[in-house]
């Protein structure tokens, strides 16, 4: 990848990070929760958004070409366009994104990028740690980056602030385990990929 493209993407991520709003949402107030994930077959991406409202499940599948290679810390370029297209169909009080939020070297993981671009509350839920130190306090494993608590690890999952949420929201969500809407989005995206 050309240096000037990487430089441009870093500038974009820094701008996203400057526009993050950390504010309390209140998980108990969330009536419409959405989750988004993506699977790949070659250069084709299969993104799914799952919405749950009062026990009713809806989902939207979006398929498209993926033009950008996988480069760690720049996942958003590859995945966010299709994820946004999938999730934009729904009005969501909270969007859960398969990936990191502020627990990213430039505080600009895919959950943060999607949250800022859509001006929506987001939380990132990732299956591996990208950056930050793990510190246990009062039986909670925090992910700390530059002295700031930005997420938590529960089981094998890493939950982090995306946008328009705060650490207490992240903790409250994480206590419920791996979110159902993300489980479904993961399954549906993989099922769609297999059918093609």
Swiss-Prot record:
Entry's Gene Ontology BP terms: DNA repair
Catalytic activity: Endonucleolytic cleavage at apurinic or apyrimidinic sites to products with a 5'-phosphate
Keywords: Cytoplasm, DNA damage, DNA repair, Endonuclease, Hydrolase, Magnesium, Metal-binding, Nuclease
Site positions for Interaction with target DNA: 70
Organism superkingdom: Archaea
E.C. number: 3.1.21.7
Gene Ontology MF term list: deoxyribonuclease V activity; magnesium ion binding; RNA endonuclease activity, producing 5'-phosphomonoesters; single-stranded RNA binding
Co-factor(s): Mg(2+)
Similarity section: Belongs to the endonuclease V family.
Name of the protein this chain belongs to: Endonuclease V
Source organism of the structure: Sulfurisphaera tokodaii (strain DSM 16993 / JCM 10545 / NBRC 100140 / 7) (Sulfolobus tokodaii)
